[in-house]
């Protein structure tokens, strides 16, 4: 299929990337750069705070209605499908999860500094919870869960953020 889409033969692809495994790893890296960094990168910008986190969940809640997300997330699928013994998944997935968790933590740290949330909030624990929430949304997308349920989960994450706000 790839050969047909690109109009090249398999040996040309392997000459460029070395092997099917190396092609897949290059695809994962490109996905991280173009999708993960684009979606989660703004969370690490100074002053991001709770609004930036809410925007991520709003995006996925709204996007669940569209056809582009029917198969979920490439890196999440790489985690689920091949299993923990797959060398690509075992290398790429921890970096992916760390990138997302660090982005959420950065925005939460900004929120704490700006007084949006209490300074005593465990921002690492909250970041890990938000990472698990967004990955859960990706799994739901992959499983073909109705869009209304996915939007509901995204809304619950946003309401959780509101519960962290300082009085």
Protein language model regions, located:
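Helix-turn-helix
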Residues: 1-22, 26
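Hydrophobic alpha-helical connector segments
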Residues: 26, 39-71, 123-130
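Short, basic, alpha-helical segments at the C-terminal edge of helix-turn-helix-like DNA-binding modules
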Residues: 30-35
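Amphipathic alpha-helical packing segments from all-alpha helical-bundle domains
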Residues: 36, 51-54, 87-113, 124-128, ...
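Amphipathic alpha-helical segments used for helix-helix packing
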Residues: 52, 67-88
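Amphipathic C-terminal alpha-helical segment
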Residues: 63, 110, 130-147, 160-167
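Hydrophobic alpha-helical segments that form the core
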Residues: 71, 76, 121-140, 153-160
């Amino acid at each position: 299929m790839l050969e047909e889409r690109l109009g090249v033969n398999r040996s040309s692809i392997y000459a460029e990337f070395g092997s099917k495994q190396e092609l897949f790893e290059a695809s994962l890296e490109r996905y991280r750069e173009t999708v993960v960094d684009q979606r989660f990168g703004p969370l690490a910008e100074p002053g991001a705070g709770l609004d930036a986190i809410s925007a991520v969940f709003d995006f996925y809640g709204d996007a669940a209605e569209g056809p582009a997300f029917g198969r979920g997330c490439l890196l999440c699928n790489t985690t689920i499908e091949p299993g923990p013994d797959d060398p690509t998944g075992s290398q790429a997935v921890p970096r992916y999860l760390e990138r997302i968790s660090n982005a959420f933590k950065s925005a939460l740290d900004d929120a704490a500094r700006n007084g949006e949330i209490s300074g005593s909030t465990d921002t690492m624990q909250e970041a890990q919870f938000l990472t698990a929430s967004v990955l859960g949304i990706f799994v739901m997308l992959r499983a073909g869960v109705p869009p209304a349920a996915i939007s509901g989960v995204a809304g619950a994450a946003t309401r959780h953020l509101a519960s962290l706000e300082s009085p």
